[in-house]
Amino acid sequence: MDKIEELAQLRENLVDDIEARHINRLNIALENLEKDVVKLANTLPLRENKLFEARLAVELRPKIKALIDKHYVLWADGTVREYDKVAKIIVDNMKILPISENFKTLTELDIETITNLKRVKFTGFLDIATETTNALADEIYQSTISGKPFEDTVKTLQHRINGVYIKADQDEINDLVELVATTTDETVKQKAIDKLHTVYGADRVGNNMRRYAKQLAHDSLMEFDGQFTKAKAAEAGLTNFLYYGDIIGDSRPFCIANRGKIFSEDELRDKWSSESWKGKSTTDPFTSRGGYNCRHHLQPTDPSWYNENGDLII
């Protein structure tokens, strides 16, 4: 592993560690949100085990929003603030490269770029908060109008937040949920997920806050990493990039074909625009690399730093 690869690996290690913490805290936040939303729903009066007071159902909307702000939006705020750690390692990596000292510090322009990127990412998390607030409030109101059994309403609310990973009464189900959230053994995880799906078959695929927030937590972090790396590289006049990262079972053909290769910006953009593959995003290679949920990184480099054999000489 040469110096450029080492710098890319350091970034990858940090980003992976930050993402793991973000997802762990998200799981906790949504578990607490689910618990509080159920508790709030239980404050509504029932008649024959059904909600019946439409006015009270409507009045619950701001209370639901307050709970989402308390648990989820607070999590999102802390998540986006931690992007500063990614920005720091990107700047620290630049200090190792043979470039002008002018580009080895955090400039006022960098701070403005970081602030704007964080604002955009936070807005994405807020969109999920708004969508979930509306979905939960609408479910309570519609259940009141239709006379839906209250226990079914509660279950729908839980699933809208956490999908199949709702807090269940059965100890076995809760143990499976905990196992999926914590195990690093993919075989064990898949068996647990399959068992959960057997119990909650209708929710195998569905819209829920956990699913979208988890995906956005990954994509936003990786997008920030890629976008700020590109900005710092452009600032320093670096227009070549090493496509870096591991290959795993579901790696896309684009990533498998390009991993370990060095491309100019134009070459990379040409490849991106001329090729199609499953999971390709609508952004660009510096934002998404191989597409949605991609874990690869682009590390700035320069052809003059290598000899005719392709060995790094800096």
Q: Which stretches of residues belong to each language-model region?
A:
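Acidic, glycine-rich two-metal-ion catalytic cores of nucleic acid-processing enzymes
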Residues: 191, 204-314
